[in-house]
Structure formats: structure tokens, C-alpha cells
Amino acid sequence: MRWKRTLQLLDVHCEGEIGRVVTGGAPKIPGNTVAEQLHWMNTDPQGEALRRFLTLEPRGTPMGSVDLLLPPKHPDAHAAFVILQPDQAHASSGSNSICATTALLESGMVEMQEPETVIILETAAGLVKATATCRDGRCEKVKLTMVPSFVHELDVSIDTPEWGRVTMDISYGGIFYALVDVRQIGLTIEKANAAKLVAAGMTLKDLVNREMTVVHPEIPAISGVAYVMFRDVDADGSIRTCTTMWPGRADRSPCGTGNSANLATLYARGKVKVGDEYKSRSIIGSEFDVGLSAVTEVAGRPAVIPTIAGRGFTFGLHQVGLDPFDPLGDGFAMTDVWGPEAGNI
């Protein structure tokens, strides 16, 4: 084969959400910090080309993300990574941290210790501690100690053409979220409503980013509302979520960074305290354990340290390559399967 670029990937899913972990063949990513590497991926033509190569057709699919492993910068970290999606590279993700941890352990890149292995992941948002329960050579469950999460603004109200005034919380859990009580748009969080939820999420994300500017007070590379997460409460008290992702799909997992952002709003409203735990349930019924382990501050703002626990499962191992004569090397997407915003890719 005459490929001019070859990368190895290990396919993992976390509670239904796919994270394809790049384990070999990636070029060196410039930057002295992971935040600088994230910025390069999102601003340099070479970074954009690598992201498109891995995430778009014919090599990529709408479902899931690509987790690009990087050499760690921090002396305590075992590995660093950024999350590649069709829109851009992202700073942090709970489900992708679980996928990366599972891949590192089950591939042997990090030595597995039974019954428990602790891995420190370095992200652009900070260090994430992953405590993996291990047995018989497999990673059974991963508990993440997430980055400090904080509220940007509660009860933001915006005008919408379809639902009138919609109220949302803008909160940070590793990236910024608009958190919306789903009943405001006349829907429930279930698989049959996935397409309608996605369309609503794309509309609301566009509207809120037009009206507000959000920037992390300490990490300026992290800015803008990345996702809209719809939320509801099930009969058993579990929080049901649906995170909508550009260009138009629903997260299959309960969403780790989204639940971290939501936990910050619950703490701000006095609804949870240190030591509390609860279940979060996704649109497909998969679950995370969510906990409030500690409180802290970020640039003078009250913040929480969330824990998120879930399972990762490996299901594939493959290579992707680029033929130098392939006219579609830059990748493409179409609205038939990629969602309503695919025409803007």
C-alpha cells in the first residue's frame, strides 16, 4: 500500500459512546502545554487537516470521538490527550477519559495492577485522576476525579422562535455547557425523540453563543458554549440527560463533563453537599455514578470537584491510512447522517 500517513486506533465505547483512541502513528503536536496543543489543533491548518482526516468520512463516522494520545507534559501524568470531533478539538470529556483509560490499560501501554490501577490523564482543562477497577486482565470500571467545575451564570433567559423564552444555566465541567430543563421545549429524553432533541440543541447553542461570550478565567483556550445538555429527573431520582453535539447528534453516554457542569449548578442552588452521590442516566439508559467529592475555587468563584464513574469496553482494532492520490483525503460530511449542520463543515 502507498499510504503516506498511517495511524493505529483502538475502538472503545463508554456506556454506548464511542471513543476511538489513537495509539500510534500520530505526528508530533506543537505546544509546551496541552492547552497550547489544543489551540494548535484548532487554529493551524495542519491540525485541522489531522482532525478532519480522523473524524470525517470516509475514515470517520458521526458516532463518537477520536482521542489523540499525547506525551504528557506534567510530571505526574501517565498520558495526555485531546478529543477530536467534527467541529474542533475539545479540552476534556468524561466518557473519552474512560475510553482512554480503558485503552491504555487493556493495550498494555500502562501496566495494569489488580485490583486497582490509578492513571493520571493530562488534559487542556487540567489533570484527571482515573481510578480503574481491574480484574482478570480487563478494566471493569473507571472512576474519574474531574477538573474543578463552576457556574458561569444561572437562569440565563433567551428568546427563541419556537419555544418562546427558554431558561438555561451556563456552567463549566471541563468545557462550557448550556443546561436546559427539557420540558421547556415540550419533549422528554428518550430514543424516539433523539432527532428532535438534536435539532433543538443545535438551535439553542447557536442562539446562546450569539448572545453571550464565555471564557475560562484561567484557560483562555477554553471558550464558548460547546454543547447543550438537556436534563430531567426520572421517577427514581436519577438525572436523565441528553447532550447534543455539533453537527447534529446525541451523546449516547450520560456525559461526564456535562454532569460535572450540572453538579456545579446543583451545589450553587444548595441541592447537594460534599459526599452526596446519585445516578445519571443517558438517552439510551446507560448510567454514570456522579459524586461531589470536594469544594474549591476557580479564580475566586465557588467550584466543585466531581467524580464520575462508568464502564469502557474495547471492541475493535484497526489502522487508517491516506493514499496520496485520494481526492477525499480532507474528509467530508453530509446532512443525511451527520445532522443539520453538516453543510457547514
Swiss-Prot record:
List the catalysed reactions: trans-4-hydroxy-L-proline = cis-4-hydroxy-D-proline
MF GO annotations: 4-hydroxyproline epimerase activity; trans-L-3-hydroxyproline dehydratase activity
Q: Which InterPro entries does the record match to this protein?
A: Pro_racemase_fam
| UniProt entry keywords in alphabetical sequence | Isomerase
> Which Pfam families does this one have?
Pro_racemase
**Induction, as annotated:** Is up-regulated when the bacterium is grown on t4LHyp or t3LHyp as sole carbon source.
Q: Where is the active site?
A: 93, 255
Xref: Gene3D superfamilies: Diaminopimelate Epimerase, Chain A, domain 1
Purpose of the protein: Catalyzes the epimerization of trans-4-hydroxy-L-proline (t4LHyp) to cis-4-hydroxy-D-proline (c4DHyp). May be involved in a degradation pathway of t4LHyp, which would allow A.tumefaciens to grow on t4LHyp as a sole carbon source. Can also catalyze the epimerization of trans-3-hydroxy-L-proline (t3LHyp) to cis-3-hydroxy-D-proline (c3DHyp) in vitro. Displays no proline racemase activity.
Family membership noted in the UniProt record: Belongs to the proline racemase family.
- The identity of this protein, by name, is 4-hydroxyproline 2-epimerase
What is the organism of origin for this protein?
Agrobacterium fabrum (strain C58 / ATCC 33970)
